């Protein structure tokens, strides 16, 4: 009720609470800036998600190209691009902020790293097999001529591509396995709150990517499967992608 909501808001303000993990029906009453979202974990597991996919497909990253859709120069996004650029044959950054990202590329990437910058709606994603979509919404994505069998990993927003021509995969979330000791630690909260949210309540998201990834590894967190707009994506779906 309204009284409980006001009490919650006052408590958050009084104690200067920075992160809130709560069940879905309460989320609408909490400031999104401090609300832990079930998708938050995905930006720390991009490499692991790609490793999961490549293992199923029997492919090697160093033989493939990676594409990034990005407009915001958030540190966590740039750290991910830098990490992944070392794993793939070429790195392709698709952005509407070309001049900004030209400076970023010059500052943070080694000379031997092959980076391509583009915003060509017709050609940029025509051959893209693996796309990490940091902050593009569906309206922006639909402006591009996208490879019909592309695999998209959507970080900020859930994306459902309605085009009948698209036969690829759009990944919107990750289903994680957490160890028994953490399940015991969370107790009855596991019944009402998404486990991704509960786990991320233990993580300091202000830290750099490497430290958070170390924490996830130490906590023995593993990917069970990936989730698309129709639910769990089967391994067979990944195997059929050329």
Locate the predicted segments by residue.
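Adenosine-phosphate binding glycine-rich loop
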Residues: 154-242
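Flexible, charged surface loops at secondary-structure boundaries
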Residues: 9-17, 30, 59-62, 85-86, ...
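Glycine-rich phosphate/diphosphate-binding loop of Rossmann-like nucleotide-binding domains
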Residues: 56-122
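Metallocofactor- and cofactor-centric catalytic cores in central/energy metabolism, strongly enriched
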Residues: 1-29, 232-242
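Structural motif
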Residues: 22-25, 69-72, 94-97, 132-137, ...
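A glycine-rich, Thr/Ser-enriched phosphate-binding loop motif common to dinucleotide/cofactor-binding enzymes
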Residues: 34-52
């Amino acid at each position: 009720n309204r009284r409980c909501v006001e009490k919650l808001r006052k408590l958050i303000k009084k104690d200067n609470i920075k992160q809130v993990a709560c069940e879905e029906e309460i989320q609408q009453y909490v400031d999104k800036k401090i609300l832990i979202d079930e998708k938050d974990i995905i930006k720390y597991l991009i490499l692991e998600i790609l490793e999961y996919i490549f293992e199923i497909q029997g492919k090697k990253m160093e033989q493939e190209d990676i594409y990034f859709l990005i407009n915001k120069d958030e540190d966590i996004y740039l750290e991910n691009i830098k990490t992944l650029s070392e794993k793939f044959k070429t790195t392709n950054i698709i952005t509407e902020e070309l001049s900004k990202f030209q400076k970023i590329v010059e500052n943070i990437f080694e000379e031997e790293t092959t980076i391509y910058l583009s915003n060509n709606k017709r050609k940029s994603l025509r051959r893209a097999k693996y796309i990490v979509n940091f902050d593009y919404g569906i309206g922006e994505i639909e402006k591009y001529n996208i490879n019909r069998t592309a695999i998209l990993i959507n970080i900020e927003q859930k994306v459902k591509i309605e085009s009948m021509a698209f036969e690829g995969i759009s990944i919107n979330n990750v289903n994680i396995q957490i160890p028994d000791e953490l399940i015991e630690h969370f107790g009855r909260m596991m019944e009402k709150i998404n486990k991704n949210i509960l786990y991320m309540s233990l993580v300091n998201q202000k830290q750099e990517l490497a430290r958070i990834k170390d924490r996830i590894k130490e906590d023995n967190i593993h990917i069970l499967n990936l989730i698309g707009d129709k639910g769990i994506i089967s391994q067979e779906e990944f195997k059929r992608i050329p």
